[in-house]
Amino acid sequence: MKKIISLAVCFVMPFVLMGAKTAEDTPPTTSAQAFVLYCPDNNTVICSKNADERMKPASTTKIMTSLITLEEAASCNSEVTFKQEMVAEGSSMYLKVGEKVRLSDLASGMMMASGNDAANAAAYTISGSPEKFSQRMNEKAKQIGMTNTNFVTPSGLDDDNHYSSAKDMALLMSYALENDDFANLTAKKSVTVEFLEPKSKKTAYANHNAERTLFEKYKSPSRKIYRCHRRKNRLYNGGRAVPCFLCQKRRCNACVRHSE
């Protein structure tokens, strides 16, 4: 699965590193089901394939959940006590019932460890339930201009009514990176969370980002890749999802979707 996702990202990279020609050029053949290379500076889609097709966003959903969490934490970085109702299947930052962290720590757990438990905890803390939190997610999506998106779960676990598109995810990533807290978090190689309870507990979460490693090989003084959202490459049921990354030189966002 890692190999296939990397191939999909490699497909987009020539446009980022070598420079796209024009939006009118015919997109090259790719095994990716959908992709978009988007420049937010002039709101231009440089090239794409099935950019508006509705697909399951999987754990890239946590871009939105983390963004809202960080926005909320900026005004009130409250204590969060992890409860049984917040437990979630799938990937986790391994919170235990009764443990306490800061609200902002949940964003770290989402972006570094892809923690479904962190996403659930944020939803309950901010809105009282995942259902109410999803309403806030959809309000934010509408504000950003995401027209082919509907969020149902804060973590991205599979639901027939939970969908987005490559273009919408590029718009979301562009918007999210305008938030300094989000941009700084996603640029880190690791984050250490100091728990409030138990006070002696500290856990380091590494950003195992294949795209970051891949892009390091292509760095040059004039075209430096400097920020990348952690790859989210699977749903609970094993589906494949959407890498999102940013190029500094041309300030372009790319999102790729690879299906089975």
Predicted regions and their residues:
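Penicillin-recognizing serine hydrolase domain
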Residues: P28-A32, S129-E260
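A general lysine-centric signal
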Residues: K2-K3, K49, K62, K232
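Sec-dependent N-terminal signal peptides of Gram-positive bacterial secreted proteins and lipoproteins
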Residues: K2-K21
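Preference for bulky hydrophobic residues occupying beta-strand positions
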Residues: F15, V80, M93, C247, ...
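Residues in and immediately flanking transmembrane alpha helices
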Residues: F15-V16, S75, E197
